[in-house]
């Protein structure tokens, strides 16, 4: 059996189905017939409490135009420590 013979029957079937579908579509729209419309889903609302939200926003972190993360002074410990002679590079107070 040839491959073309197998697929020839497959090609003939969609042509028959299309002609049957077009006939049924022509009969479907009748005057005075009520059409059912599916009810739309209600839009979800944000029920999150503002007291428990992250102050930096829901998206996580701010980013620069290049895509780098933006850190604030508290995260970098700027202004904290610096009381030892090893500061700012060899100290253990800033960690």
UniProtKB/Swiss-Prot annotation:
InterPro entries: DUF1764_euk
Basic and acidic residues bias locations: 18-28
Region (Disordered): 1-64
Matching Pfam families: DUF1764
Signal peptide per UniProt: none
Regions of compositional bias (Polar residues) in chain numbering: 35-49
Cellular component GO terms, alphabetical: cytosol; nucleus
Disulfide bond annotation, renumbered to this chain: none
Regions crossing the membrane: none
Taxonomy, superkingdom: Eukaryota
Name of this chain's protein: Uncharacterized protein C6G9.01c
Organism whose genome encodes this protein: Schizosaccharomyces pombe (strain 972 / ATCC 24843) (Fission yeast)
Lineage of the species this protein comes from: Eukaryota, Fungi, Dikarya, Ascomycota, Taphrinomycotina
């Amino acid at each position: 059996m040839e491959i073309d013979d197998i697929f020839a029957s497959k090609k003939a079937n969609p042509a028959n189905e299309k002609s049957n579908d077009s006939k049924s579509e022509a009969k479907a729209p009748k005057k005075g017939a009520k059409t059912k419309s599916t009810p739309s889903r209600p839009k979800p609302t944000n029920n999150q409490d503002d007291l428990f939200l992250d102050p930096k926003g829901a998206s996580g972190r701010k980013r620069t135009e290049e895509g780098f993360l933006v850190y604030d002074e508290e995260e970098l410990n700027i202004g904290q420590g610096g009381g030892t002679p090893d500061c700012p590079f060899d100290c253990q107070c800033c960690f």
